[in-house]
Structure formats: C-alpha cells, structure tokens
Amino acid sequence: MGNKINPTGFRLGITQEHRSKWFATSKTYPTLLQEDDKIRTFIQKKYSSAGISDVLIARKADQLELELKTARPGVIVGRQGSGIEELRSGIQKTIGDRTRQVRINVVEVERVDADAYLLAEYIAQQLEKRVAFRRTIRMALQRAQRAGVLGLKVQVGGRLNGAEIARTEWTREGRVPLHTLRAEVDYALREANTTYGVLGIKVWVFKGEVLPKEEQTIPVGAIPRRKGSRKPQQFEDRSNENS
C-alpha cells in the first residue's frame, strides 16, 4: 500500500501536518475549500520564480493566515515590505472579499536541495529546456546528496527525449521507506510542458525517522549542525494586528 498511496496523505497526523487548518459547517465548507485552492493557484502563478515550496493556510474567525515557504523570500517581500501589501490585495481580490483580514508570514526554506517540490521544479525547468532527462535526474541526485538527504527517488513519465512511445523511468539513491509511517518522506508531483507533450515528475525525499517520544527527525549518521550556522530568514506580517 505504501507504494501506491500518496506519501503525504498516508502520514497525516503522524509525521505530516495538514496544509489547511480550519473548521467549517457543511454549508460553508465547499466555499472555503474553493478559496484555499484559488489562493494557492494565484500564489504559485504570480510568484512562479520565487521557488515557493508550500502554502499553509489557517483561519481564525474572520482572519486568514498564510505561511509561505520559499527559497527566495526577497522576491515576495519586496522593498520595505511593498510586496506583502501587493500580495494581500491580490488575495483579497481573488477570494472576492476586500474587507477580509489577511496575515502573511514568509519563511525561507532552510535546505533548498532537500525539498521535494523545489527539486521537482528544478527537474521540470531543465526538461523544458530540452536537457536530457537522465542527465537532469543525475544532477538532481547530486544536489540532494550535497544537501545531506538520506534517500531520494525520482520518477519521470511521458515521451522521454521525444520518443514515439511514452514510458516511465525511475531511479533511487539511498533509502526511501514508503511503508514506514514514522519515516519523514517529503513528496511532490510536478508537470513539465515540453514540445513533445507533458511529462510527469514525482520526487520522494527521505529525511529521517521521527521517534515517538522525542517527536524529532533524527537522520541516521547525520552530522550535527554547528551552533554558529546561519538561520533561515523569516518575515512576519503584523500590519493587521493594530487594525
């Protein structure tokens, strides 16, 4: 079952958290669910060059809280936070409510090459530039190894290198335990639009195992970080708190 099911949904409540956190009645649930989809689509389309890994949404009363995990936070924040205001107005326009309070928190991804979505996006960009898929996968594996991941699996399907018959090929480096629930497996699905058609890209990244008592990911054989290492940047928007 671990080979077929979505790794994120399989581990919800164990090592993975829900991307949307809110409660709604049966009448308002469809509307809020559609809002979440519109918000994520708008952000991914507007900031396609910002390397956005994930968009977390939380709702409290009439307040909407967003957490954007990105590889390039400066692209979103802009000069003196002007990008945050532009993003807020765009979200309010997307959901059709100009009075909705929107709080935005931008978090920098600490290890870009260890993030499944960013790796899948990198592979898609290379394939759209007509780079050979085997070379692209090999480069992605090397980047992930330098980032210190314990295992990586990449699968690409479609008309590879312009072949007449579509096929699927995959490769794996290290351990990727799909059946182990305590294993923290980051998963992403991406599409690459090439001149020969659409290629599907799937990436699994194994980062370690979460122990039940400590609730911490402890990579096997990982080198501990130095105390003086650089911390990821975090930009929190508090402009709506006084309103």
UniProtKB/Swiss-Prot annotation:
InterPro entries: KH_dom, KH_dom-like_a/b, KH_dom_type_2, KH_sf_prok-type, Ribosomal_S3_C_sf, Ribosomal_uS3_bac-typ, Ribosomal_uS3_C, Ribosomal_uS3_CS. One of its GO terms (cellular component) is cytosolic small ribosomal subunit. Pfam families: KH_2 (PF07650), Ribosomal_S3_C (PF00189). GO terms for molecular function: mRNA binding; rRNA binding; structural constituent of ribosome. Residues 221-243 are annotated as: Disordered. It comes from the Bacteria. Residues 39-110 form the KH type-2 domain. Residues 233-243 have a biased composition (Basic and acidic residues). SMART domains: KH. Part of the 30S ribosomal subunit. Forms a tight complex with proteins S10 and S14. PANTHER family: 30S/40S RIBOSOMAL PROTEIN S3 (PTHR11760), SMALL RIBOSOMAL SUBUNIT PROTEIN US3C (PTHR11760:SF19). Binds the lower part of the 30S subunit head. Binds mRNA in the 70S ribosome, positioning it for translation. This is Small ribosomal subunit protein uS3.
